[in-house]
Amino acid sequence: MGRFGYAFQNYDATRHVRSSVREKDMSHKHAREVAVAIKGLSIEKARDYLQAVVNKDRAVAFRRYKNQVGHKADPGMMSGRYPQKTAREFIKVLDNLESNAEYKGMDLDRLKIVNATVHKGVIVKRFIPRAMGRATPKNNVLTHVELVAQEI
């Protein structure tokens, strides 16, 4: 895998800590909604929220990709889902972010997520053979996730 850059601009190594994961097999639409949900939270609150999503105690509000998505009973939420696979991957990125902050000597209680970016990655193209010599495409879009936290 080659070198990559970060989408976050104005990165200051003394104030910010960042972590990323590349080409993970998760829905980029779910990842976008989870990223919006955890932006602005502390690392501990984000981890608790994502663990509640995995346990199906709290839902993630779907604001952009909400067609045919049912309503949830969480306060202040219309459409929502429980993207468990995506939440598990985000917990791993948060763990990496926390270890990077410890390595830099930052105070973990004062860290706040200031940027959560999601990009589409490589498309893994496959096909399903059908009758009469036809084929149906079955594409899998991989996802890049970047998190940046800052000491507040």
From Swiss-Prot:
Any one of the GO BP annotations: cytoplasmic translation
Molecular function via GO: rRNA binding; structural constituent of ribosome
Keywords: Ribonucleoprotein, Ribosomal protein, RNA-binding, rRNA-binding
InterPro entries assigned: Ribosomal_uL22, Ribosomal_uL22_euk/arc, Ribosomal_uL22_sf
GO CC list: cytosolic large ribosomal subunit
The organism's place on the tree of life at top rank: Archaea
Coiled coil: none
PANTHER family assigned to the protein according to its UniProt record, in alphabetical order: 60S RIBOSOMAL PROTEIN L17 (PTHR11593:SF10)
Summary of subunit composition and partner proteins: Part of the 50S ribosomal subunit.
NCBIfam families to which the protein is assigned, alphabetical: PRK04223.1, uL22_arch_euk
Family that this chain belongs to: Belongs to the universal ribosomal protein uL22 family.
Function: This protein binds specifically to 23S rRNA. It makes multiple contacts with different domains of the 23S rRNA in the assembled 50S subunit and ribosome. The globular domain of the protein is located near the polypeptide exit tunnel on the outside of the subunit, while an extended beta-hairpin is found that lines the wall of the exit tunnel in the center of the 70S ribosome.
Entry protein name: Large ribosomal subunit protein uL22
Source species: Nitrosopumilus maritimus (strain SCM1)
